[in-house]
């Protein structure tokens, strides 16, 4: 994201960290399941995808083995994160069924699924609602100029297509996470306009749990030749986002992409009160290992922030879930405090 000169000039080389706050920051104890890495989009900043047909799909038996192993781990969320099969591909139905079956298996194994699998049809979203406590899709940036650059070969990154997902999630009463990718060629006003659009949709549907502010972080697989988003600018972006978004939307940042501990604290103090799903591997940014919960506590506690686990669905949305899902969530609300 390009920032006006006046904004850049105001950015200090040291974060403005205040006095101990006695505040709370949250995270979700999570594990990521990837049904497939294959994706028909070719976003130039991507470090996740493989070409269609080049990687195998996760089998249910392999997932069952993973879920069995996780029974003794402190994990509540199963993030189903998938590459995208084209909506008109003959493999689309099998792909969707695999995602549904993995969600169902996660539930029966005692976990809480959250799916992010790119744009879905209304019927697909409706079906997945029955086996997910929440879902998500990044807006990234809504400016159409990115369709000429980083999204030139990414048909599902059409802004109107992704906005439609947020509207359908509202219609279906699906607790939803969305977010922005910072530093992929957008301008500063593009960022604010995307946040304002999210705010307006939430005021209509009241369904957005979290907005992720994810700084572009170069990886070994991408072809996009651009530096990492400047972490010194992130607290300022967070503070502005906090002004734009309704107070009941939580701002989330990925802590492994803010590698300076002081700047991570500055981001939390600026208003990013959630650190996302913490698991063994960041599948989207594999070159940046996750900081684990104890490491994050060692950073946050000395400056007055308590790190607290949460579920992948916020309490105000429990009533939107089926009775079966509500029962699973109730069990976890009693357990997660012991993590």
Swiss-Prot record:
Keyword Lyase: yes
Record-annotated Radical SAM core domain positions: 25-256
The keyword NADP belongs to this UniProt entry's keyword annotation: no
UniProt xrefs under InterPro entries: Aldolase_TIM, CofG_family, Elp3/MiaA/NifB-like_rSAM, F420, rSAM
Top EC class for this record: lyase
Top-level division of the source organism's lineage: Bacteria
Residue positions binding [4Fe-4S] cluster: 39, 43, 46
GO MF annotations, alphabetized: 4 iron, 4 sulfur cluster binding; 7,8-didemethyl-8-hydroxy-5-deazariboflavin synthase activity; iron ion binding; transferase activity, transferring alkyl or aryl (other than methyl) groups
Required cofactor names: [4Fe-4S] cluster
Pathway connected to this protein: Cofactor biosynthesis; coenzyme F0 biosynthesis
Enzyme Commission (EC) number: 4.3.1.32
Enzymatic reactions: 5-amino-5-(4-hydroxybenzyl)-6-(D-ribitylimino)-5,6-dihydrouracil + S-adenosyl-L-methionine = 7,8-didemethyl-8-hydroxy-5-deazariboflavin + 5'-deoxyadenosine + L-methionine + NH4(+) + H(+)
Reported function: Catalyzes the radical-mediated synthesis of 7,8-didemethyl-8-hydroxy-5-deazariboflavin from 5-amino-5-(4-hydroxybenzyl)-6-(D-ribitylimino)-5,6-dihydrouracil.
Family assignment from sequence similarity: Belongs to the radical SAM superfamily. CofG family.
NCBIfam families in alphabetical order: F420_cofG (TIGR03550), PRK06245.1 (NF004884)
Complex and partners: Consists of two subunits, CofG and CofH.
Name recorded for this polypeptide: 7,8-didemethyl-8-hydroxy-5-deazariboflavin synthase
Species of provenance: Nostoc sp. (strain PCC 7120 / SAG 25.82 / UTEX 2576)
Chain's gene name: cofG
